[in-house]
């Protein structure tokens, strides 16, 4: 195997990347290699989707399937080799069906692409693993060099992140043909093994720009369905009663679960990136949406083991449920998979509910501990004039966006320490699961505004971008001239594409950590620093002094 897509990848003096029997995430070499083969098949499918569009053929089955299958290869999403093979088989079936449609329209229709006619060598895992060796992501690294390889990975992993957001938006009924056309173009292009550095850099920015549009339709999909988030207090301590825990990003799954558990006596708790759900009017109206349970995803093996109910994983992040001996209580949805655990097909949660009713539940209610969420796009925009007035009165010195992914690396304590060191005349915005490093702390208020503003999930970076643009317009300056600094933690591919989105929009001087992506060479990091001022975090004191002195 060779996988270098997440922050916890193995790093050695001779090179970075997981390349043994199992990756740091728990993904086996078998699953990793089969995912590489799936990616190659999906690149061929995208090549045919582009040809079809030339002939005015848009196959919605292909558009719906392709990003979803690609999403399954993200970190901590699907560890089930058989389901990865199933995606590859389905991709070939869709590709051949689309090719037939193209040839009915134009008998000479062909696609000149190295993956356009790729067939699986068999149905058994040993045969497919042998075939997958030809599609290892580092197969020609020694030939093209570390910089080209690193840029390919930047594009590939960024596109994976965008594909995940496309799937989240699709679940909510959002579709934009222009976005899907761009996605297929980038995916097919990556299948040609590009080597031109300038093209690779430009297309990475192109993927970032595309993702801004993806986040926009996802934002509208969520707010159209569930209303605009409102500041809402959330209890992070359990109450007595039967319980189901739901994790991931899929608000539609949460809505269905809430509807199906209403009146059953089962309380629903959010976990991880599902926390922002409590701010949506159409979700928080359910009285049995009891609160939020747990902390960052990396602690789930301990926290899920203690949860006395059923658990539903709607998207990333899942890790080995057998370690905490709760594999029989966890259920996967959609693209999520772990070998041997229950997988829910369709929209009927009755099996989960029945299991929860048969489990102990929480024996008593703990003393409440409330945190506040729900500072979404409309709420932020409504506060824009207040923020501007406070800046003008010199009552608000600076705004920090401290967010991104959480993880297990010890150095991530930086983000807790950083927020605690933010001066009292400054505000902190946060989003994504990195917030669990500090979101239960009391930061107080500034002139009536909470000093900690929870914007939402990782994709709600869109709301923060919209606020920054609006503030810049009102102040007659550029976004980079605002008293605003971004301090971002990364772990996986969604964070990569959000970084690309910010860079593509011209946002500069972003601080990132806890480490640089393992696929970015020193040369590439120097380019990003030179073009965008992107820099690695150092110490809290040094970074804070640098930011406030600017």
Swiss-Prot record:
Protein name per its UniProtKB record? Hydroxylamine reductase
Catalytic activity annotated for this protein?
A + NH4(+) + H2O = hydroxylamine + AH2 + H(+)
Xref: Pfam families: Prismane
A GO biological-process term:
response to hydrogen peroxide
Q: Entry's Gene3D superfamilies?
A: 1.20.1270.20, 3.40.50.2030
Q: Which residues carry this modification: Cysteine persulfide?
A: 405
GO CC, one annotated term: cytoplasm
Q: What does this protein do?
A: Catalyzes the reduction of hydroxylamine to form NH(3) and H(2)O.
Q: Which cofactor does it need?
A: [2Fe-2S] cluster; hybrid [4Fe-2O-2S] cluster
Spell out the family assignment given in the record's similarity comment: Belongs to the HCP family.
The species this protein was found in: Pectobacterium atrosepticum (strain SCRI 1043 / ATCC BAA-672)
Write out the annotated subcellular location. Answer: Cytoplasm
Please classify the protein's predominant subcellular localization into one broad category.
cytoplasm
């Amino acid at each position: 195997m060779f996988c270098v897509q997440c922050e916890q990848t193995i790093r050695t003096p001779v090179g970075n990347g997981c390349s043994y029997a199992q990756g740091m995430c728990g993904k086996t070499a078998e699953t990793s290699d089969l995912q590489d083969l799936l990616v190659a098949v999906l690149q061929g499918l995208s090549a045919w989707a582009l040809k079809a569009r030339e002939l005015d053929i848009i196959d919605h089955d292909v558009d719906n399937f392709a990003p979803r299958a690609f999403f399954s290869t993200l970190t901590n999403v699907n560890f089930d080799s058989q389901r990865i093979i199933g995606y590859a088989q389905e991709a070939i079936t869709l590709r051949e069906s689309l090719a037939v449609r193209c040839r009915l329209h134009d008998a000479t229709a062909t696609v000149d692409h190295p993956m356009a006619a790729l067939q699986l060598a068999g149905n058994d895992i040993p045969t497919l693993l042998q075939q997958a060796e030809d599609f290892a992501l580092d197969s020609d690294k020694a030939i093209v060099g570390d910089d080209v390889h690193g840029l390919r990975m930047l594009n590939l992993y960024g596109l994976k992140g965008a594909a995940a957001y496309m799937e989240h938006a699709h679940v909510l009924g959002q579709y934009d043909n222009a976005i899907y056309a761009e996605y297929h173009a980038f995916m097919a292009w990556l299948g040609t093994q590009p080597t031109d550095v300038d093209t690779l850099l430009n297309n990475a920015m192109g993927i970032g720009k595309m993702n801004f549009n993806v986040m926009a339709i996802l934002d509208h999909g969520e707010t159209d369905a569930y209303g605009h988030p409102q500041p809402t207090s959330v209890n992070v301590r359990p109450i007595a009663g039967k319980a189901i825990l739901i994790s991931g990003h899929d608000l539609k799954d949460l809505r269905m679960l809430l509807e199906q558990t209403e009146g059953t006596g089962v309380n629903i708790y959010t976990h991880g990136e599902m926390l922002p759900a409590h701010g949506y009017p159409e979700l928080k109206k359910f009285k049995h949406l009891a609160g939020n349970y747990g902390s960052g995803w990396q602690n789930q093996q301990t926290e899920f083991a203690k949860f006395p109910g059923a658990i539903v994983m709607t998207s990333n992040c899942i890790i080995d449920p057998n370690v905490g001996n709760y594999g029989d209580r966890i259920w996967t949805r959609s693209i999520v998979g772990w070998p041997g655990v229950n997988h829910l097909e369709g929209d009927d949660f009755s099996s989960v509910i029945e299991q929860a009713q048969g489990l102990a539940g929480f024996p008593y209610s703990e003393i409440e501990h409330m945190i506040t969420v729900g500072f979404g796009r409309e709420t932020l925009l409504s506060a824009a004039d207040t923020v501007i007035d406070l800046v003008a009165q010199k009552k608000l010195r600076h705004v920090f966006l401290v967010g991104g992914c959480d993880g297990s690396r010890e150095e991530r304590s930086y983000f807790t320490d950083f927020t605690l060191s933010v001066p009292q005349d400054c505000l902190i915005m946060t989003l994504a699961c990195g917030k669990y490093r500090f979101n239960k702390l009391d930061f107080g208020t500034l002139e009536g505004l909470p000093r900690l503003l929870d914007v939402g999930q990782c994709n709600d970076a869109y709301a923060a971008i919209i606020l920054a643009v609006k503030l810049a317009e009102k102040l007659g300056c550029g976004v980079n001239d605002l008293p605003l600094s971004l301090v971002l933690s990364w772990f996986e591919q969604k964070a990569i594409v959000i970084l690309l989105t910010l860079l593509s929009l011209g946002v500069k001087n972003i601080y990132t950590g806890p480490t640089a992506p393992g696929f970015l060479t020193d040369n590439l990091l120097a380019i990003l620093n030179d073009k965008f001022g992107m820099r690695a975090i150092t110490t809290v004191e040094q970074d804070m002094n640098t930011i406030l002195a600017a």
